[in-house]
Each structure stands twice: as structure tokens, then as C-alpha cells.
Amino acid sequence: LLVGGSHLIKKYGFSFTEIKKAKYKNIKIVKIDQKEANIEKIYLNIFKKSYKLFLKKRPDLVFLTGDRFEILAIASVCLYLNVKVVHLHGGEITLGAIDDAVRHAVSKIAKFHFVTTETYRNRLIQLGEEPKNIILSGSPSVENITKHKIITIHSLEKKLDIELKNYFLLTIHPETIKNQYF
């Protein structure tokens, strides 16, 4: 199991502890200097480390999830070393985000796909992927929600030290690219 990225960052929850609890054997950590804002260095570092590891271990299959640029580096290594890729969350759309290009590129490299909706399955088929290799699985994140204790409003108020009378939740996915032609 190759673990890196936000799994190793405390401010994002250091989910590596959860991975260790699952008692996987042969966990390889890929530490990337997160202070380094240079995407080129991060990408090349991931590419080099993954390439060396995959040459040594010769995996039959690599499972990638999401749309972050880091997984494109790993998918590229798999492409050149002829390692099959399983991709979770292909076919999804995030308008105005570079994520789409990364996600679709990884989907084109992948041999097998786990998608969360029929719409995303159809999108992968439109991209030329084999229908027999696309599995409608739903979202593991949604499944995970049912396993966690939901915090009460009172507990949240206490933790944040604010009173939540009339409230709403707004999430924003920042626009990372704009269509220059329209």
C-alpha cells in the first residue's frame, strides 16, 4: 500500500493512523515536502518515487482515487510500466476546475473504473471506456458517513464557541481554471 499526500498531514486529519489500524502489510510511505509549493517538484518527486517502487515491486494493479494532480503522476508511471490502474470517481465533473482534466486523464489510463452514479458511468463510456470495465459502486465516502457518530448542534456550538441559531452551510470548490475562449 502506497500512502502519501494529505494522509500524512496533521491539519487534514492525519488519516494515516486509520490506515495503520486496518493492519495492512507492506505499507510504503511517500513523503512529499508539502511546504514546497512548486507543482513541478512535487509531481516529479512522486513520479520518481513511484517509478522506483513499481520497478522493484512490480504490482499487478494500482488503485487510484480522485482527481488530484499527484495521482496523475502515479497513473503516468503505471502507463509506462504497463501496470493496470483501477480508478475510483472517474467521469465526474467539477466545472471550472483543473480536477476535470486530471480525472479524465487518469480515467483514460485506467483499465477498470468504479463510478458513483450512472451519469458518470455514461460519461466514461462516451470517453471510449469499455462498459464491461465500469462498475457502478456508489461512493465510499457516503458509505463512511453512516459509520461515524454525528456531532450534535449543541456540541458543535460548544466546540466552536458560537451560538448557531439561524445557520446554513456553504461549501465552495474554488475555480482553478477558466475557459479562456468564452
Write out the residue ranges for each language-model feature:
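Short beta-strands and strand-loop turn motifs
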Residues: 1-3, 29-34, 85-90, 138, ...
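Conserved nucleotide-sugar phosphate-binding/catalytic loop shared by glycosyltransferases and other
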Residues: 2-42
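A nucleotide-sugar donor-handling region in carbohydrate enzymes
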Residues: 7-11, 109-181
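Residues at alpha-helix caps and immediate loop-helix transition turns in enzyme cores, especially N-
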Residues: 11-15, 74, 98, 182
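Short, well-ordered coil/turn elements that cap or connect secondary structure elements
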Residues: 21-24, 80, 129-131, 163
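Active-site and donor-binding regions of nucleotide-sugar-utilizing enzymes
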Residues: 32-131
